């Protein structure tokens, strides 16, 4: 039952994508997963217009990942840097930076909660590639654009005994 429900959510999210990328809509807010998976450039090319808000919590998370030497952090920071060249959107950095305890408990959803709070305060559509974040935001009554990330195929190695 859960698996079917999950697939229905993904199909519905894709079907409604063109309705949610509305030129009349003013504010969009992104989470870390959308930045790392390089979805923003694609959305802008599909017609995303208006104000794109990048929470300071997302920037802090990307900086933290980059400082730890993780590729996702560097990828995310490069993507944000590239967004400055698009004239179709107005880029804005907003919201509180997370505290040490919020960073420590990021896996339990502390940073996601900061992003949802900012989306509520700015009346923004949340753009995410995290299914849990999307469902939580919908439960709070936020409008969400969920974009499924491509899964990397695992390389399989076979050893043959001769």
Language-model features: locations:
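Active-site-proximal, substrate-binding regions of enzyme catalytic domains
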Residues: 15-127, 131-140, 145-146, 151
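Short glycine- and acidic-rich boundary segments immediately preceding or forming the N-terminal edge
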Residues: 1-16
